[in-house]
Amino acid sequence: IDFYEELFRDLKRMFPRIRLHALGAPEVAHIARISGLTTLETLRRLMAAGLDSLPGAGAEILDPDVRRAISPAKPSVASWLAVMHEAHTLGLATSATMMYGHVEQPRQRVDHLLAIRDLQARCPEGKPGFLAFIPWIFRSTGTRLEAEGISTDFSPLEYIRIIAASRLILNNIPNIQASWLTVGRQTAQAALHSGANDMGSIMIEEHVVSSAGADN
């Protein structure tokens, strides 16, 4: 954790107006484990060093069977939810995500949305909790799942339906973000007419989804 504390303090000193939106729940859990800390202690120290908000990375699909199939090394459903709840109790704003289109079934997508909604409902009054929800399509290029015969099957209409369902179910989360980086600008623009109210940010550099086949 010392590395991140020093990094965050240096960034805040050099760029006082910058807001640090960094480290998802898996990273927080990993830092806590290798530092001999609880995740709550880890979050407190990172916030003291300058962390402003936590991205929703690593949520994938919040279902134990799905996670065992696609990301067995990542924290469990319970761990992801626990880190986010701790962040909320400390007043740290977060976002939530859903990566769909691999081995999950429609009911597991719905269960994922309900888990996010229920966690937001537990956010202490006056704390920001989840500020946004961002669903995106699984990109298969170069992944282990592709080698097992599971490839990207992107449908713009399905994405629009997921955006609409997210807006209806997540009535306690203020913003639904269209992931233009993974679905393309045209689909993201259509999503703005279907429940999304956020297009996210312009990225200076991105290597994760581009390496998996996204070319937006």
Whereabouts are the PLM-identified features?
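Conserved Radical SAM active-site core
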Residues: 1-118
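Auxiliary Fe-S-binding modules of radical SAM enzymes
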Residues: 14, 35, 113-114, 121-216
